[in-house]
């Protein structure tokens, strides 16, 4: 509960000064923004016999505070706070044996698409922002590139058979790089994981379980 209170307090702090483009005496202004995004996951590392099935992706939302770098505010740094919900469906099946979690690759046309794993993250984006905006222009082209630090919470697995498993072997902290670009509200989002999500684990066959993703999706900004 105390952690939630701290996150809410931090979110409110970042939201101070939300009214963007409020300096009428100069060309300087802030583009403080809420965002919402949805992405499709593509597994980036080669795992023997691995198959990604169905729709695997995430949704995320958050807030970015804008700090202009020039007098026209066309370049800026952004610091944010967000929440992500991630889920992927594949033929990776976690199984509980002797009070520990093992992983196997299911080779079965019927069962391979039935294994779903989900997890949540609190993200801290830091980005460089370029835009063709002005103090009176609300529709413009933008390119935002940056780096995310993420605090991850336990994995939840719904295997093809058996009960739901809670997996504590998730990397507590991971990072990614990203690029968001587009016009007005609609923007393309590209993101690449720099770390695997599961801590140094092998499958029961001895193959390294290096689960990390490339994300392709859309991100929407709201003032």
Question: Positions of the model-derived regions?
Answer:
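Residues on the lipid-exposed face of transmembrane beta-strands in outer-membrane beta-barrel proteins
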Residues: 61-67, 81-83, 124-132, 145-151, ...
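Outer-membrane beta-barrel transmembrane strands
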Residues: 114-135, 141
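Surface-exposed strand-loop-strand hairpins of Gram-negative outer-membrane beta-barrel proteins
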Residues: 41-59, 169, 198-200
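Short loop/turn motifs that connect adjacent beta-strands in outer-membrane beta-barrel proteins
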Residues: 22-32, 68-75, 133-141
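Bacterial Sec-dependent N-terminal signal peptides
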Residues: 1-26, 218, 222-223
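Residues that define the transmembrane beta-barrel architecture of outer-membrane proteins
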Residues: 30-32, 53-59, 118-124, 171-177, ...
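Predominantly the C-terminal beta-signal and adjacent terminal strand-loop region
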Residues: 25, 43, 168-223
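Extracellular/periplasm-exposed beta-strand and loop segments of Gram-negative cell-envelope proteins
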Residues: 47-54, 89-119, 152-178
